[in-house]
Design a protein with these regions (language model features):
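Catalytic beta/alpha-barrel core
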Residues: 98-99, 184-191
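Short, surface-exposed connector motifs at secondary-structure boundaries
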Residues: 116, 176-184, 305
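A generic "binding-loop/recognition-motif" signal
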Residues: 152, 191-192
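Alpha-helix-loop-beta-strand connector modules within alpha/beta enzyme cores
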Residues: 167-181, 199-207
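Catalytic glutamate of the conserved HExxH
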Residues: 212
Length: 330
C-alpha cells in the first residue's frame, strides 16, 4: 500500500475508496423480532437491511434462538417453528433486499441481484430437542449450521457455562456425524472445552466457532484457547470474532478487537478468522461500534496498520464463505 493511500486512509476517506464485503457468522435478529416485534428492514437494533445495503456484498447467518426461561409454556421445538415463521415472513416481505441461501452459489446469485444473502442457523440443539429427525427437518427448512449447545448443558454435551467438565454424549457424537453427512456446519461456540475436543476428534472436515474470541487475550470461558484455535486451523475452519464487550476486555474499543484478531493471526489464522458479531443478542459493544454500520471502522483500522486489502477481505468475508462452500454443498 503506497504512502499516498495511507494519507487518504488516515483522513477517514475509506468509505470513498473501498467497497466492503462482509459475511457475519452470528446474529440474534430473528429472536429480537419475535420477542419485540418489528422486522428486518429497519430496526433500532444492531442490524437491519437498511444498513446491510451500505456494503457491496453482505451475508449473514441468522440464528433461531430461544431460552425456555424467557418463553415459559412454549416447548422449544414449537419456539423453533415460530421463529422460523418470522424468518420466512421477513424473507417474503423484503424479497427486494434479501434472499434465503443454502449454498455459496446461492449467495453469489443473491449478490448479483443486489441482495443480502441470508443463511439460517440454530443456536442450541435443545431447540431441536437434540433429536436427529428434527435435525433433518431443520435442514429441510434451510438450516445450515447448529450450535451444539447454548449456555445450558443438554443431551448432546456440557456447555461453557453448565457441566463444563462434560463432553459429547453418544447422542452428541451421532449428531455431529449426521451434521457432517448432511452438509451442515458444526458450531462449537458455547460448547464445553471437552466437548470442543470431542468435536475436533470426530469432524473430518471444517467446523467453526461462529462467535468466539481469544482466551489468551481476554480470559473468558466463552473464548477459544490457542490450542482450540489451532485445531480450527487444522480443520480448515474459522472463528468469528464476537463484538460483546464482556468477551473482549475492559472498556474495549477498536484496538481491543484488533488485539484478538492479531493474536489469532500470530497463530497462523489468516485464512481462519471471520466475523461473528452476535448482533442483536448482546447488551454491550466496544466504544465506537453501535452495529454493523460501524464495521468500516475496523476495516479502515486494519488497513492503517498495513494489512493488505486482500487479507482484510478474507477476514471480513472470504474465509467464512470458503467454509460454507466446502461444507454446505447442497
Amino acid at each position: 500500500m503506497g504512502a499516498q493511500q495511507l494519507i487518504y486512509i488516515s483522513k477517514g476517506r475509506i468509505r470513498d475508496m473501498y467497497e466492503i464485503d462482509l459475511f457475519d457468522g452470528h446474529c440474534d435478529t430473528i429472536s429480537r423480532c419475535f420477542e419485540r416485534g418489528g422486522g428486518f428492514r429497519r430496526s433500532g437494533g444492531h442490524l437491519d437491511l437498511e444498513r446491510t445495503r451500505k456494503f457491496r456484498r453482505y451475508a449473514q447467518f441468522f440464528a433461531i434462538f430461544g431460552d425456555s426461561a424467557a418463553t415459559p409454556g412454549i416447548p422449544l421445538w414449537e419456539l423453533t417453528q415460530r421463529e422460523y415463521a418470522v424468518f420466512r415472513r421477513e424473507m417474503a416481505e423484503n424479497a427486494d433486499l434479501i434472499v434465503h441461501c443454502r449454498t455459496g452459489g446461492e449467495a453469489e446469485a443473491a449478490y448479483a441481484a443486489g441482495k443480502t444473502a441470508a443463511f439460517l442457523s440454530v443456536e442450541g440443539a435443545e431447540l431441536l430437542d437434540c433429536d436427529l429427525h428434527k435435525l433433518e427437518e431443520a435442514r429441510a427448512m434451510g438450516v445450515r449450521a447448529v450450535n451444539l449447545t447454548w449456555n445450558h448443558a443438554n443431551a448432546l454435551s456440557g456447555s461453557n457455562a453448565e457441566e463444563t467438565h462434560r463432553g459429547l454424549t453418544e447422542r452428541g457424537r451421532e449428531f455431529v456425524r449426521r451434521m457432517e453427512a448432511l452438509g451442515m456446519l458444526v458450531d462449537v461456540s458455547h460448547l464445553s472445552d471437552r466437548g470442543f475436543w470431542d468435536v475436533a476428534e470426530l469432524c473430518t472436515g471444517p467446523f467453526f466457532a461462529s462467535h468466539s474470541n481469544s482466551r489468551a487475550v481476554f480470559s473468558a470461558p466463552r473464548n477459544l484457547t490457542d490450542a482450540q484455535f489451532t485445531a480450527i486451523i487444522e480443520h480448515h475452519g474459522v472463528a468469528g470474532l464476537n463484538m460483546f464487550s464482556d468477551f473482549l476486555g475492559e472498556d474495549p474499543d477498536v484496538e481491543t478487537v484488533v488485539a484478538h484478531l492479531e493474536h489469532f493471526l500470530e497463530l497462523g489464522g489468516g485464512k481462519n478468522v471471520a466475523r461473528g458479531g452476535d448482533w442483536d443478542g448482546i447488551s454491550k459493544t466496544p466504544r465506537g461500534f453501535g452495529g454493523i454500520q460501524d464495521m468500516d471502522r475496523l476495516f479502515e483500522r486494519l488497513l492503517q496498520r498495513n494489512y493488505t486489502e486482500a487479507l482484510v477481505r478474507d477476514l471480513f468475508h472470504n474465509n467464512l464463505m470458503r467454509v460454507v462452500n466446502e461444507v454446505c454443498t447442497m
